[in-house]
Amino acid sequence: MIRIALLGCGEHSRISHATPLARYAALNPGVIELVAACDLELTRAQEFCNQFGFARAYSDAESMLSKEQVDGCVCVMPMNSIVSMAIMLLERKIPCAFEKPLGISSAEAEKLGLVARETQTAHMVSVNRRFMPFLTEAKSWATAIGPIQYIRATQVRHGRNERDFIWSTAIHALDALRHIGGEIISFDADVYRQAELSTLWYGVSIRFENGTRGRLEVMPTAGMVEESYELLGEGFRAQVLAGSGPQRSLRCWQNGELKLEKTSSETEAEDLRNGAYEEVVEFVRALKTGTPPRPSVEDILPSARICFAISESATRQVEASA
């Protein structure tokens, strides 16, 4: 069996990593073994063992990795520890999956990219929008009809006034646009900083290499939680309500008619709706076949570069208007 360990047992790890790992183990007997869970708070790791079936609990990563034979490691760290822990795993040649963002600065992201290229260790970045079932279906449906001419992503949140939002969270939506539209050749970021707003809002116009145009709208303090994607072309439109919102839906129109409509049930497990389970499927597939999982740091680095550039531009705009 493939032996998988988990580093980090916080709430996000519970929902987006431990839950789908346990689901995969239950649905595919004899394929993976959840050998260990590790957290600085040992009681958390022990709780993961009891709830999700990890065999042993640790409070120290070094101890876990020296005692366990690990075929793959899922690493879920606070933002300021993502790069150091990811580099440790890459340099140990341990196939791994780790969370976005790729560090807390552009320099950290570039350092992680360099180590990934130098070590050539199999790894995967967790950006679940690339695996979200409704968004995947929308992309396939629209692409089958004709070239996508315009893509829009809108990320709405409530009370998210942290200054790092554009590169720590909005990277999800920006990366989803790249996943659908391809490489971005230029972008123009407009920063909204009104007296009534507690933080920055963003509007980003995008040009893709293939000629497609796009738009990213980020409103972190708009009073509710929703994330939407629209894929448009001559005679068709696909709309996905996704992300962390309460309603998940897919609607596709062609030539004035609604051709496809799906809505997920609130009783459906979150990891099946948000792409987390499909991420596990991809990681295990790669471990089974000995092939690199996707997406890699190299795949996500362009998204990180753009988000950090938008953040730096926003800082300059705010300083200039002060």
Residue spans of the language-model regions?
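N-terminal Rossmann-like dinucleotide-binding module
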Residues: 1-52
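C-terminal helix-rich "cap/oligomerization" subdomain common to oxidoreductases
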Residues: 6, 72-77, 283-322
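Beta-loop-alpha module in the N-terminal Rossmann-like domain of NAD(P)-dependent dehydrogenases
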Residues: 41, 52-114
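Hydrophobic residues in well-ordered beta-strands that form the structural core
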Residues: 98, 123-125, 240
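A contiguous active-site-proximal alpha/beta segment in oxidoreductase catalytic domains
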Residues: 103-160
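Mid-domain beta-loop-alpha active-site segment that forms a flexible
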Residues: 126-133, 155-187, 200, 299-300
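C-terminal glycine/acidic-rich active-site capping loop/insertion
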Residues: 128, 230-298, 319-322
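Contiguous beta-strand/loop segments that form the cofactor/metal-binding neighborhood of enzyme cores
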Residues: 168-247, 277-291
